[in-house]
Design a protein with these regions (language model features):
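Acidic/histidine-rich helix-loop elements
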Residues: 45-47, 51-58, 100-114, 142-148, ...
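Alpha-helical cap/lid subdomain in secreted, periplasmic
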Residues: 96-102, 117-267
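Active-site metal-binding loops of divalent metal-dependent hydrolases
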Residues: 87, 108, 138-139
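Conserved beta-strand elements of the Class I
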Residues: 82-84, 104
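Short hydrophobic segments within beta-strands
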Residues: 84-85, 174
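Pocket-edge structural micro-motifs
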Residues: 85-86, 243
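Short, solvent-exposed loop/turn elements at domain surfaces
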Residues: 89-95, 112-115
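N-terminal secretory targeting modules
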Residues: 1-82, 90, 94, 127, ...
C-alpha cells in the first residue's frame, strides 16, 4: 500500500511538473485541435492511409531514394534537367515527349510545395542538374495535406529557387494549370481550387520569374478555355491533362528549358 501511495505521489508530481513546463513554452496557448473534414469516398481513405506515413517522412524522401542512388552523375557536357512536381509531373512521360533528352522525373502525386522544399536537396540538388522545372501549387490551394495561404506558397517557391541559385541550377517555373468541373469526376473541383486564386498565384509567379531572371513556362494560357477553365477535351477528371494536354505543354517546357540553359545560373 505504501509502495502504491509513493508511486501515485510520483505520478502526480510528474504531471504537475509537466504542466508547469508546458506553461513556460513560448508556443502557448496549446496547439489547436482540428476536426477532420469529410474528404469523400476516395480522398478520405487515401488521406487516412497517407497521413501516418507523412508523420514519419513528410517530404516522402524515401520514394526516390533508391532511384537517386542508382542514377549516375551527368556525363561531361550533359545538361540534365530535373522535373519536380506533383501528380501532373509524375504522370508526364518525359521520354515520350522529350525523346533523347537527359530529363529526370521527380514528381510525386498529391504533394504540396512544402513537401517539395523538404526533398529539394535529395531529389534535385544531389542529381547535379543544369536546370530544374518546378510545377507545383495546385494541391496547396486545395488544402488536402497542408493549409497554405498564397503568401506561404510563394515563400516555398522562393525558398526552392534560393536553393537552386546556391547550387548554380537554372530555374524554370511552370504556371499552375487551369482546372474545370465539366464532368461528374470533376464536379467538386472548383470548390477548393478556386480559379481566381490559381490565376493570382500565376501572376505572382510570372512577376517573380521576371524579377529573378528565371524562365516561366506558361502552360495555363495554352490549356485554358473561354470560361477560364481547363479545356474539356484535355482532361477527364478536371485537373490532370491527357496526352493531348501534355503535347501542348511539352513545347512550352522545351522552349523555357532552352532559354534557361542559354543563360548564366544565378550566384
Amino acid at each position: 500500500m505504501k509502495r502504491f501511495a509513493a508511486l501515485l505521489v510520483g505520478v502526480l508530481i510528474f504531471a504537475a511538473t509537466a504542466a508547469s513546463a508546458q506553461d513556460r513554452y513560448q508556443s502557448s496557448p496549446e496547439r489547436r485541435v482540428v476536426a477532420e473534414k469529410d474528404w469523400g469516398p476516395w480522398l478520405g481513405p487515401f488521406r487516412a492511409q497517407l497521413v501516418p506515413s507523412l508523420m514519419r517522412d513528410f517530404g516522402e524522401r524515401y520514394l526516390y531514394a533508391p532511384a537517386n542512388t542508382a542514377l549516375p552523375a551527368p556525363r561531361p557536357g550533359e545538361q540534365r534537367v530535373v522535373f519536380l512536381g506533383d501528380s501532373i509531373t509524375d504522370l508526364w512521360e518525359l521520354a515520350r515527349f522529350f525523346p533523347g533528352k537527359p530529363y529526370v522525373n521527380r514528381g510525386i502525386g498529391s504533394q504540396v510545395t512544402a513537401q517539395m522544399l523538404l526533398r529539394f536537396h535529395q531529389d534535385v540538388v544531389a542529381l547535379k542538374p543544369s536546370a530544374v522545372v518546378i510545377l507545383a501549387g495546385v494541391n496547396d490551394v486545395h488544402g488536402f495535406l497542408q493549409q497554405e495561404t498564397a503568401a506561404q506558397i510563394e515563400a516555398n517557391y522562393e525558398a526552392m529557387a534560393d536553393i537552386a541559385d546556391r547550387h548554380h541550377i537554372r530555374v524554370v517555373f511552370g504556371s499552375i494549370l487551369p482546372v474545370n468541373n465539366y464532368t461528374d469526376n470533376a464536379k467538386s473541383m472548383l470548390e477548393d481550387r478556386h480559379p481566381e486564386e490559381l490565376r493570382a498565384i500565376n501572376r505572382w509567379l510570372a512577376a517573380f520569374c521576371r524579377e529573378r531572371g528565371y524562365q516561366y513556362a506558361d502552360y495555363y494560357s495554352a490549356l485554358v478555355d473561354d470560361h477560364r477553365l481547363l479545356q474539356r477535351d484535355l482532361t477527364t477528371d478536371g485537373i490532370h491533362p491527357l496526352a493531348t494536354g501534355y503535347a501542348r505543354m511539352a513545347p512550352i517546357a522545351a522552349a523555357a528549358i532552352a532559354r534557361a540553359l542559354r543563360s548564366h545560373p544565378r550566384a
